[in-house]
Curated annotation (Swiss-Prot):
Belongs to the DapB family. SUPFAM superfamilies: Glyceraldehyde-3-phosphate dehydrogenase-like, C-terminal domain, NAD(P)-binding Rossmann-fold domains. (S)-2,3,4,5-tetrahydrodipicolinate binds at residues 153, 162-163. This is 4-hydroxy-tetrahydrodipicolinate reductase. Keywords: Amino-acid biosynthesis, Cytoplasm, Diaminopimelate biosynthesis, Lysine biosynthesis, NAD, NADP, Oxidoreductase. Its EC number is 1.17.1.8. InterPro entries: DapB_C, DapB_N, DapB_N_CS, DHDPR_bac, NAD(P)-bd_dom_sf. Transmembrane segments: none annotated. NAD(+) binds at residues 7-12, 96-98, 122-125. The gene is dapB.
Amino acid sequence: MRVAVSGFKGRMGHEVVKTVLREADLELVAVLDHEPKEKNINEIVEFSSLDVPVFGNLSEMLEEIKPDCVVDFTTPKVGYSNTKTILEHGVRAVVGTTGFTPEQISELRSIAESKKIGALIAPNFAVGAVLMMQFAQKAAKYFPNVEIIELHHDNKLDAPSGTAVKTAEMMTETREFVKQGAADEVELIEGARGAEYEGMRIHSVRLPGLVAHQEVIFGAEGQGLTIRHDSYDRISFMSGVALSVRKTKELETLIYGLENILD
């Protein structure tokens, strides 16, 4: 498959480029960056042996290169517009950018289906993180008192993380509604109890040195249960990205969540 990478200078995008280069059945045909200084990726020392054009305009890249799939790891500010542009050009998309609303996902799915092309948006591409979300979904049926703590590097722009939101969404499918905390609790400092989602609390930590971590803490009379996943390196996401790129060939719709393509 001929693959283009959008946001290739970001930490995740850089790792995606290296992954595409490693995979025998994937070919890196273009990279995209906002206002790039380079015209070819070989102007970067690490990739000096390659011959891959660098673009600053997504539509121009799609029309000139015509890739089979675009992997997008950019920012929440442009993630939706990028994905819409990719799909409208009839190109498959794998998107790790977060911050999509349910309405935006629905609209993008309609475009994918009208074009009969596959696309996948995932808050997290680590298989371990997907298992964490599935385990939490199952546990929530028996432990409705639950809070989420997600921890990421201090350059992450959105909070809470897409993984935390997706986890909460999945738990609402099995969890009996319970509003966390005392009915008359008072926050001495605003926000001390975290964000609220369907009665659950979500807490976001941003610190240097972290990559991506999350724990889901359940409490009940006389017992507790904690489910935690840690990504110590961005390589942890790459098997999921490569799987998703290949899977888009079999799809004619947009899938939200890596768990929906795992056997």
